[in-house]
């Protein structure tokens, strides 16, 4: 299946798994924002340290604004294959189209590592 139009670069499986792990750790030891509305607000306010976007969001328009907004605000973002997995990592029983890590907590080094790898992928 073709990637949705809002997916601007290919994310290796290992990096996607690290992003989900970072969400879980930040959920427990820091602060996250769950869902596209909360994520958008966190990006607009410059609070997000890392934005995680699911690749299987339908309709695409729900999250299509996030990559350009993150680029404008210079906030790193990464894709994960499944909104169901992203929701679970965020501690939800429902899928989440996107999540923003506000305070990484004990995931700080992991978030910094992901941000660095994402910069390489975007070149």
From Swiss-Prot:
Protein localization: Cytoplasm
Metal-binding as UniProt keyword: no
Gene Ontology MF term list: ribonuclease P activity; rRNA binding; structural constituent of ribosome
Disulfide bridge positions per record: none
GO biological process: ribosome biogenesis; translation; tRNA 5'-leader removal
Annotated GO CC locations: cytoplasm; ribonucleoprotein complex; ribosome
Keyword Ligase: no
InterPro entries: eL8/uL1-like, Ribosomal_eL30-like_sf, Ribosomal_eL8-like_CS, Ribosomal_eL8/eL30/eS12/Gad45, Ribosomal_eL8/Nhp2, Ribosomal_eL8_arc
Keyword set, alphabetical order: Cytoplasm, Ribonucleoprotein, Ribosomal protein, RNA-binding, rRNA-binding, tRNA processing
Function, as annotated: Multifunctional RNA-binding protein that recognizes the K-turn motif in ribosomal RNA, the RNA component of RNase P, box H/ACA, box C/D and box C'/D' sRNAs.
Record-linked PANTHER family: RIBOSOMAL PROTEIN L7AE FAMILY MEMBER
Family: Belongs to the eukaryotic ribosomal protein eL8 family.
Complex and partners: Part of the 50S ribosomal subunit. Probably part of the RNase P complex.
Annotated NCBIfam families: eL8_ribo
UniProt protein name: Large ribosomal subunit protein eL8
Gene name of the encoded protein: rpl7ae
